[in-house]
Amino acid sequence: LQAYRRHWVAVHERPVVGHDLQALADLRRRHAPLVRQIRRRFASPLAGAPRRERRLPDGDAVDLDAALDAQVARRAGHSAADDRLYQARPLHQRSLSVALLLDCSSSTGFAIPDRHAPAPDTAADDVLWMAAGSRPSLALQPPRRVLDVTKDAAALLCEALQAMDDRHAVFGFSGAGRLQVDIGLVKDFGAPWAAPAGAALAALKPQGATRTGAAVRHAAQRLLAEPSRRRVLIVLSDGYPQDSDYGSGAQALTYGLQDTAQALREARRAGVASFHLSVDAAAHDYMRHICPPHRYWVVEAVDALPARMLALVRLLARPA
């Protein structure tokens, strides 16, 4: 029938409360080179709001430097003092709101293989260590999960957007069927990117399924309430859309892909641009059915995602 089902999906948005107020400081230390790069690159006038135009014949405010120069010139007896004494905002003032949707489904709890880990012990190694009398103690670190890396990438995005003074919000999403689509509000548009938001981001846990279409529609509606001229939705996921009631077999995959693609089309028609980042190495197989090739990236090395996110921010920093 090509029609929507009324009251078919229930989305529940709730604030995420975190208790680790050191999480943001820890992240900034962990990614210190990238954070320094962000502050150097994105806190500059080239990245943020354009400078006011000065020394104009008319404008919305007096240019104090120009007025002072004109006064000095008059007192010095110069009759042809410059009368361009005003300043104004550029006509194309930067105005951007960004919403980040972070996939928190169960699969994001999978551990990432450590490319720098030593090779597994062999039987010969055991014999050698027994002869030496002991095996050296190694500090065991818990394995990094997909969600740990995507949360770091989300935090670095917030660092850059805050440096540019752009409004931004972060939502985690997961669910368990059409009546339980969970949206965790990590940071709202008007809230600062500070320790409480960092703690909320750190508190996100992998759980449930990936009903991406419903999450996209919800985030798009939140963006449409924003006063900015440009509205951008970024979806960060580790796999294709799936939920318990999508059906079985190929039908389940087709349903999720088509629903997500339709949600993104609706958002675009309403004035919300979108970009999709996937850390699934096989994502090209299905992402081309969700959005055009220039609207998604596949990051095959998950631990390269934070740096890749900064490349996306550079695109956002360009004038509309």
PLM regions with names:
Residues 91-236, 241, 275-281, 308:
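Von Willebrand factor
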Residues 1-98:
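Acidic/polar low-complexity segments with low predicted structural confidence
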Residues 114-119, 184-190, 247-254, 289-295:
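Short secondary-structure boundary/capping segments
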Residues 293-320:
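C-terminal helix of von Willebrand factor
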Residues 138-139, 283-293:
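Glycine-rich, charge-decorated loop segments at or immediately adjacent to ligand/cofactor-binding or catalytic sites
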Residues 203-209, 220, 239-288:
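VWA/integrin I-like adhesion module and closely mimicked acidic/polar interface patches used
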